[in-house]
Amino acid sequence: MGVKKLSRKDYLNILESILFIDFLKGLSVTLKNLLRRPITTEYPKEKLTPPKRFRGAHGHYVWDGTEPDSLKAIEKFMSYEKAKSRCVACYMCQTACPMPTLFRIEAVQLPNGKKKVVRFDMNLLNCLFCGLCVDACPVGCLTMTDIFELANYSRRNEVLRMEDLEKFAIDFKQRRGNEPDRIWPNDEEREKLWGKIEWSG
């Protein structure tokens, strides 16, 4: 049996093993990022504004005169009041939801034959925040706001009533209603997280 000759590639592999070349390559990445500004936000002292399309707490849009004219036909079979929820108790949100136990919707028939929603509860402990209920709503009543601080000490407080949902939507519409629909609220906040983006040409 003859002596095996080592090729140039084998010599380089041995040299890399002795000098820890791969280790130094990995360490260079670490050292390069060590000098960069961290992207972490010191929550709760510092808070970022979520984008308008953020999937936070749900809200109920109310009858305020800004709804489309096509919804005026609802007057024939629904009893509604100004500044109250647009919900028509069609149960489409509950049907579309992967967790239908999340909703508790009740409506009553009034003496004049019209229907009135008396209860709309959402148990956020069951919610996946997928937004399927918002897409399914035929009257554009349901929306998702930018409210994300929903932690509570009691399970009972995780159930949102219709009044809570109305307040969330009114507040969201006043704060962000005229804002353009963008992924990031502004370039400053995006740069704070990811640095200045330079396009390669």
Curated annotation (Swiss-Prot):
Its cofactor is [4Fe-4S] cluster. It is found in: Cell inner membrane. One of its GO terms (cellular component) is plasma membrane. GO terms for molecular function: 4 iron, 4 sulfur cluster binding; iron ion binding; NADH:ubiquinone reductase (non-electrogenic) activity; quinone binding. Its main location: membrane. [4Fe-4S] cluster 1 binds at C87, C90, C93, C137. Pfam families: Fer4_7 (PF12838). Residues 78-107, 116-147 form the 4Fe-4S ferredoxin-type domain. [4Fe-4S] cluster 2 binds at C97, C127, C130, C133. Its EC number is 7.1.1.-. It catalyses: a quinone + NADH + 5 H(+)(in) = a quinol + NAD(+) + 4 H(+)(out). Keywords: 4Fe-4S, Cell inner membrane, Cell membrane, Iron, Iron-sulfur, Membrane, Metal-binding, NAD, Quinone, Repeat, Translocase, Ubiquinone. Belongs to the complex I 23 kDa subunit family. NDH-1 is composed of 14 different subunits. Subunits NuoA, H, J, K, L, M, N constitute the membrane sector of the complex. HAMAP family: NDH1_NuoI (MF_01351). This is NADH-quinone oxidoreductase subunit I. The lineage of its organism: Bacteria, Pseudomonadati, Aquificota, Aquificia, Aquificales.
